[in-house]
Amino acid sequence: MPTDNADLGQEDIDVFDNGRESFDRLNKPVLDGIGIEGNDDDDDDYLTLYNMTPRERLMYTFRRSMYKALDHFNSLPKWQRLLIILFGALVIVLGILMLIFHNKILDKVLETSKDLNERSSTNFILLVLLFFVGFPPMIGYSFLSTSTGLIYGVSFHGWFVLALGSVTGSVASFYVFKNLLHSRAEKLVHMNKRFEAFASILQEDNSYLMLALLRLCPFPYSLTNGAIAGIYGISVKNFTIANIITTPKLLIYLFIGARIKNMAEDHSTSSRIFDLVSILITLIIFTLTAWLLYFKTKQRYAQLKNQAVAQNSSANREVDFEI
């Protein structure tokens, strides 16, 4: 028999309120993702996933990511949405062409890589290109790095060329934006809310080890060079050291390039499948490692944020006590 709220006991009301609160908390991230209401992405409530099974967590995370991506896409200006659609169509067309003409394409890649390897000017050209893609908003760093692997394979020669061009370009970009384009560097910091969080960490700890950790996180290469220059207290020396100690990761690009070259040299299906699987596994491991470092650093940011809030609360209580 139905009852109204007047007939409910206090305990029943508490249970109802707690259930509604739990429902709101569970659905809050999804609502945030589709833009209904909620706080910033960095304020996600991880407790919503606590009682879910691994499969439920995977589906929940996938749906939430799709909602966020769709909401972000719809919030973009019309010309940017058009560019994304055109880029997606271009990728699909290139993928189809690769499936149809993959033998001819790989043969041409092999021929070009051998030709460039024999030219003495290739080293200088690669160094210049790698140097300039370090300046925002230039793009193409991953392409050039993989091309270095195509030409020289996994070798000290290839690593040295790639490392020298990357480090000098990054340091030069950092120096220019720090001393000549500082206002532009500060704008780059605020272009991404996640990068703002890292900027807060670097203001607390601007050591070369923390900078190296940031260099391993999944941020755009050239934009990171300019944005770090907008963070107060970071020296050219520490930035240079951070870039040098992260050069071993460049071997990943060389390995991928070498595997692509090997696919062009060996026409057997089994060998190509092995090379392709090797590339995919390498990319997955590299991506997972980068995101793991990102989330670990994000946790550090949350700790610093909580410490700052606690210190402010303590200071306010002391002021109130003195009054």
From Swiss-Prot:
Q: Coiled coil located at which positions? A: none
The answer on whether this UniProt entry bears the keyword Transmembrane helix reads yes
Gene Ontology terms: cellular component: Golgi membrane
Spell out the Pfam families in the cross-references.
VTT_dom
Q: Which residues lie on this side of the membrane: Cytoplasmic?
A: 103-123, 170-237, 294-323
Q: Region VTT domain: which residues?
A: 149-260
Location in the cell reads: Golgi apparatus membrane
User: What membrane topology does the annotation report for this chain?
Assistant: Multi-pass membrane protein
Establish whether keyword Membrane is in the entry.
Answer: yes
- All disulfide bonds of the chain are none
Question: What keywords would UniProt list here?
Answer: Golgi apparatus, Membrane, Transmembrane, Transmembrane helix
Q: Which residues lie on this side of the membrane: Lumenal?
A: 1-81, 145-148, 259-272
Which biological process terms from the Gene Ontology are attached to this UniProt entry? mitotic spindle elongation; vesicle-mediated transport
Q: Show the stretches that span the lipid bilayer.
A: 82-102, 124-144, 149-169, 238-258, 273-293
**Domain-level remarks:** The VTT domain was previously called the SNARE-assoc domain. As there is no evidence that this domain associates with SNARE proteins, it was renamed as VMP1, TMEM41, and TVP38 (VTT) domain.
The record describes the protein's role as: Golgi membrane protein involved in vesicular trafficking and spindle migration.
**Which family does the record assign?**
Belongs to the TVP38/TMEM64 family.
Database matches in PANTHER family: GOLGI APPARATUS MEMBRANE PROTEIN TVP38 (PTHR47549:SF1), GOLGI APPARATUS MEMBRANE PROTEIN TVP38-RELATED (PTHR47549)
Know the name of this protein? Golgi apparatus membrane protein TVP38
